[in-house]
Design a protein with these regions (language model features):
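Amphipathic alpha-helical segments
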Residues: 11, 15-18
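Intrinsic disorder/low-complexity segments
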Residues: 119-142
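Catalytic palm subdomain of template-directed nucleic-acid polymerases
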Residues: 100-107
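Short, conserved secondary-structure transition motifs
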Residues: 130, 139-158, 276
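A translation/RNA-centric and nucleic-acid-associated enzymatic feature enriched
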Residues: 14, 24, 30-64, 71-100, ...
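Short amphipathic C-terminal alpha-helix that caps PH/PH-like domains
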Residues: 108-118
């Protein structure tokens, strides 16, 4: 345990140095919140006395963007009920970072640079801060981009844009798309989701340019390393009315599933009109440590004492 925790501490220091050197400001927001974002199948643990433990600091960090901050990051605990396994833990550590005036392509570049800085590639340092703390060293990593529409056409045999089916989309993601991503190996960005799977992401407009998509898609990507999902990124939706509609639709879906009915965070919704353009990402620290230390179980990279 001592060896892994020392490596983890060095990795987290490396993450902080990367963002500090880029001019980001580290922030802290509340772990207990009153109004989680309503998302299907993501349940926040309730707190005695009221409120919930956060599944993500996303809404609170976007409020900071609306208050005038430009580049921010946060490392801290997050919680999800009912998630436990070799890659899941009810409590986990996340880093989220956000940029005003950016898109998901800017965050994509951030992530590539961060992974190289931390050691996934020939530029890796096999000692960190003078300590003998080896991390995984591989040849220069290959990063691939796979678009969701192409992935479903090629590996699932149907087009979610022409025949949307939420259950089928989720099932095929787990049984066909993610295994295909694992077979590619290395880093894979799964990009450009159907509008129905936009979550809190901005929708693109269909283009008439011959080299650009002629259909609308959510400016969203998820990143996998050797098949392990590591990060989820959006060009942020900054349209107040559209976000309210999506939240209300998600609340209705949660009611049908008999899941907790979270109150809406109107302070967040109203703040969107003061952001205009932004992008951000959530990345699992525990899973990143698993990758860099070649560890198979998430429980082995956390201090369970």
């Amino acid at each position: 345990m001592k060896d892994i925790l020392e490596k983890r501490a060095a990795i987290v220091r490396g993450i902080r140095k990367f963002f500090d050197d880029q001019g980001f400001v580290e922030v802290e927001t509340a772990v207990r919140i009153d109004a989680p974002a309503p998302e299907e199948h993501i349940d926040c643990p309730p707190v005695v006395g009221g409120g919930y433990l956060r599944a993500s600091p996303e809404l609170q960090m976007k409020k900071l963007l609306a208050a005038g901050m430009d580049k921010i990051y946060q490392i801290g605990p997050c919680f999800r009920e009912g998630e436990r396994g070799s890659r899941h833990n009810p409590e986990f550590t996340m880093i989220e970072w956000y940029r005003r005036g950016a898109t998901y392509l800017d965050i994509k570049r951030d992530l590539k640079e961060l992974l190289l800085e931390l050691g996934v590639g020939e530029r890796c340092r096999c000692t960190m801060e003078g300590k003998n703390l080896p991390v995984l060293c591989t040849p220069t990593p290959k990063f691939y981009t796979l678009r969701v529409r192409d992935a479903y056409r090629d590996h699932a045999g149907w087009d979610p844009w022409t025949e949307w089916d939420q259950d089928r989309f989720d099932f095929d993601m787990a049984t066909k798309i993610e295994p295909a991503i694992k077979s590619i190996g290395g880093g894979v960005f799964l990009m450009d989701y159907p509008p129905q799977a936009a979550s809190l992401a901005k929708l693109s407009r269909p283009s008439k340019h011959p080299n650009l998509p002629d259909f609308s898609y959510a400016e969203r990507w998820e990143f996998y390393w050797d098949g392990l999902e590591l990060a989820n990124c959006f060009t942020e939706l900054c349209d107040r009315d559209e976000q309210l509609k999506r939240f209300e639709k998600a609340k209705d879906a949660r009611k049908l599933l008999k899941e907790s009915d979270y109150p809406l965070d109107y302070e967040f919704i109203d703040s969107l009109s003061r952001i205009e353009h932004a992008a951000g990402v959530a990345l699992g620290i525990d899973r990143l440590v698993m990758i860099l230390t070649q560890t198979k179980e998430i429980s082995a990279v956390r201090a369970h004492i």
